[in-house]
Regions:
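Bacterial N-terminal signal peptides that target proteins for export
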Residues: 1-9
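C-terminal motif of bacterial Sec signal peptides marking the signal peptidase cleavage site
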Residues: 17-20
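Bacterial lipoprotein signal-peptidase II cleavage site
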Residues: 22-28
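Cleft-lining beta-strand/loop regions that shape enzyme active-site pockets
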Residues: 33, 44-51, 62-77, 87-89, ...
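PDZ/PDZ-like domain segments forming the peptide/carboxylate-binding groove
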Residues: 47-48, 56, 60, 131-167, ...
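Extracytoplasmic/secreted proteins, especially bacterial periplasmic and envelope-associated proteins
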Residues: 50-60, 77-84, 96-103, 107, ...
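Conserved PDZ fold ligand-binding element
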Residues: 58, 62-66, 84-88, 200, ...
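Extended, small/polar residue-biased N-terminal targeting/export presequences
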Residues: 69-178, 196, 209-275, 347-352, ...
Length: 544
């Protein structure tokens, strides 16, 4: 009886949402129920996929273009609007679909056009990443809906959109924190899964500076994942989210909680040498001294051992999982993520690691740890240098470890290194301070140098990005005249990559090493239904 009453309550709740399809400016959707969406289809035919594709585009376009979602006026909840539309749009024919969507846009309220406000965004220094030409397709959308969408492009919008704005005044990074992540939604039904897909797809469409760099055309991703998100069921939702995010091939684009999680780990320092996962030294080394072959890693593993499998799973198989479920910009990132996951992929008390030493193969059991805050999962090579993070390798060559560097020590560092012929800046670990302007610009630039091009969103015209060409340095006759060498590898990411780009812009700057992880630029966080969060690179970064 208790079970029956629970089911009855849920049924009435779902019916209430489905029935609440009224329109008009007066509706208030701030108290959206979250038990179920009112749409729980599990199969979609070709027409339904087409309908949902159009719905996603029109809903997202209106969300970011209609004045009803700007400023502090009105209380429309854009998620509730979508959930109301889903059941009727999914099963409509094309004519009915277009009529209903046009009626919905009318219901959001009247708007005026102000094309003159956007004229400057069509000139030099702006890039238009979103493909908005689909709004003019009258054969697909019908004349009324198409006309409304085309007019919305240059609607008179005031203030910021309620679902995206700059992170802080003067910031270029978007803030999506007003999006509802529905953290108490433990088993998202079809409607909420499609809400996640539609929200994410439109964020990328209008606010992702690297949209044009995805391996698969972003337009092609939508219909494919409409089927996936509809048919996967609540139990497959997490995996589909992970695979969707992987379509970006952006090493910043992590999903939390990860689809490949674990609570326990072993601390083995390893990295790919070619296609082989090799154990490498894990403790600080003197840069002058060759590394002996018998340095222990985590006993009984030693420097030079090749890891063949972990818990019965080959390294190639783990790498395949990473490609499928973890967003990686390049093969270097695939190798890095594989290395991390190989040793954080179980909740068991121990790992079984198969390894090769010389011509012999053996297996070892290593106890796991759960004190994740004790230290990093994987140690990166580092050298014992001074407290200032610098040292003289010899009279001609200086060395700076970016991971131990501080701008406060800049003057003292240059006093030590100023008479050298070259300075190596080691960027193989994440910089501990932002050295671009206060250090590199101050001591290494003879004049103002445009070292990078950034692109960041124009919030009043979604899909448009403004170019920014910042400069480092000023007229400085006493600048350092030696060579400046950025040392990079597969651990170099984000701010470290930006630092390397800046070094290359210096008069005698160059980069030495191997391919970096490929995730430059600031990040933005996107909440998704079910309490999930994901990141994107939110700033386009280009060589000048």
């Amino acid at each position: 009886m208790r079970h029956f009453l629970s089911e009855l309550c849920i049924l009435f709740l779902c019916m209430g949402i489905a029935a609440g399809c009224g329109s008009g400016n007066g509706r208030n959707d701030t108290a959206l129920p979250t038990a179920c969406s009112g749409f729980n289809g599990t199969k979609v035919d070709t027409q339904a996929v087409c309908n949902l594709d159009v719905l996603c585009r029109v809903w997202g376009y209106a969300k970011y273009h209609h004045p009803a979602f700007y400023g502090t006026k009105g209380q429309l909840d854009v998620d509730a609007e979508l959930l109301r539309l889903l059941p009727t749009i999914c099963n409509a024919d094309k004519t009915e679909r277009n009529r209903l969507l046009a009626e919905w846009i009318h219901s959001l309220g009247e708007f005026t056009e102000a094309p003159e406000r956007y004229e400057s965004y069509c000139g030099e220094g702006f890039r238009h990443e979103a493909a908005t030409t689909w709004t003019a397709d009258t054969a697909k959308l019908g004349s009324e809906l198409s006309d409304l969408l085309c007019r919305l492009r240059f609607a008179d919008r005031r203030g910021f959109n309620r679902y995206v704005k700059p992170r802080q005044p003067g910031s270029s990074s978007p803030d999506f924190s007003r999006e509802n992540g529905y953290p108490n939604l433990t088993s998202p039904d079809t409607g909420y899964r499609l809400l996640a897909l539609f929200r994410y797809w439109n964020v990328i469409e209008y606010f992702y500076p690297n949209r044009h760099l995805t391996d698969k055309q972003w337009d092609e991703v939508l219909p494919e994942y409409i089927r996936r998100f509809t048919e996967c069921g609540p139990e497959g939702y997490h995996a589909q989210l992970a695979m969707l995010i992987t379509e970006l091939h952006d090493s910043h684009a992590m999903l939390y909680p990860a689809f490949l999680p674990a609570e326990a780990f072993i601390q083995v320092n390893a990295q790919f040498i070619g296609d082989r996962l090799m154990v490498v030294p894990s403790q600080p080394a003197d840069i002058h001294t060759p590394i002996p072959d018998d340095i222990p890693a985590w006993p009984p593993l030693r420097f030079g051992d090749e890891i063949l499998s972990v818990n019965g799973k080959s390294i190639d198989s783990i790498r395949s999982d990473i490609r499928k479920y973890v967003s990686c910009s390049n093969e270097t990132a695939v190798g890095f993520r594989t290395t991390v996951y190989a040793f954080t992929s179980t909740d068991a008390d121990e790992y079984v690691v198969e390894y090769r030493r010389g011509n012999a193969t053996d297996t070892v059991r290593i106890a796991t740890r759960t004190d994740r805050n004790a230290r990093e999962f994987i140690d990166f090579p580092k050298y014992a240098v001074s407290e200032e993070g610098c040292m003289l390798i010899n009279d001609r060559i200086g060395y700076i470890d970016a991971a131990q560097f501080s701008n406060e020590q800049g003057r003292r560092i240059m006093n030590v290194l100023k008479n050298t012929e070259a300075i190596i800046i080691d960027l193989r670990r994440y910089p501990s301070d932002f050295m671009i302007f206060a250090f590199l610009g101050k001591y290494f630039a003879p004049y103002a140098i445009n070292h990078v091009i950034f692109t960041h969103p124009v919030y009043s015209l979604p899909g448009c990005f403004r170019e920014d060409r910042p400069a480092i340095g000023h007229d400085n006759p006493d600048y350092y005249r030696g060579a400046v060498i950025a040392l990079v590898d597969g651990n170099t990411i984000s701010q470290a990559e930006y630092t390397a780009i800046t070094v290359q812009a210096l008069p005698r700057g160059l980069t030495v090493g191997s391919t970096t992880l490929g995730a430059d630029g600031n990040i933005a966080e996107i909440p998704l239904p079910g309490g999930y969060k994901t990141l994107i690179s939110s700033l386009g970064v280009y060589y000048p």
